Amino acid sequence: LSMDFMHFTLSRIATLDSLAAFFILLMITLLIYGLKLADRVLAEGRKAPSMKLVAWMILDGFAVGMGVSTKWTGFYAMLAMAVCFLFFIGTWFRKQKKNRKPVRYVVTLCIEGLGIYSLLPLGVYLLSFIPQMKAEGARNLWEVMWNGSLYMLNFHSEIVFKHPYESPWYTWPLDLVPLMDAGDFIGEDKVSLIATFGNPLIWWAGIAAFFYLICRVVRKRDR
């Protein structure tokens, strides 16, 4: 992140994206640790829930809630985490059935995960609207959250702001058209510009690494 232009720009113009990126990295890191811990617990033949694993999942659930509450970008990351979690659940279930071992722990883990990763983020997201509720003098927190979420959804889905410096979203991964944030003339011969774009060395290499990992998973994954 310290070498990426986009992170540098977004952190300097005080957007929420840097905070959202932090929580997304945190929740994914905690998920990876939790999956590894669950795999070790399962290999030990445990049949009852592991409190250590549940504690890590709860911590991760709070991180997910903070990410979603900071910016809805965290919600998309949460969906990706759900797919990853269910994929591992399915893999463990098939492995236990194949080895003729009880699947009780896998089922329990699935129920715990779905509950924690659904209720905790929703609770944190709901609580994040308390300042808004106090500012409006309202009493129904759920109504404030619902109306605020609908307002944000409608605003971003209906906004149309055409200008010559716009950057189509499909050009972002390749850095084809930098997003111009601000511009101003300084004197007669100088211009001040603020643009958002990624470091091509990192982004282009990241795209190549992404497709390499996809091929590696398909060809060499543990069957």
Please place each PLM-identified region on the residue numbering.
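Transmembrane and membrane-interface helices of multi-pass
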Residues: 1-4
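Short acidic/glycine- and proline-prone juxtamembrane loop motifs at membrane-interface regions
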Residues: 12-19, 70-73
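Transmembrane-embedded, aromatic-rich helix segments that form part
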Residues: 21, 59, 73-94
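Transmembrane alpha-helical segments
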Residues: 23-35, 79-86, 123, 206-214
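Membrane-interface transmembrane helices that cradle and orient dolichyl/undecaprenyl
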Residues: 27-56, 86-95
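Membrane-interface helix-loop-helix junctions at transmembrane boundaries of multi-pass membrane enzymes
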Residues: 44-51, 93-112, 208-223
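Aromatic-rich transmembrane-lumenal/periplasmic boundary elements in polytopic membrane proteins
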Residues: 102-114, 121-175
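Hydrophobic, aromatic-rich transmembrane alpha-helices
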Residues: 185-222
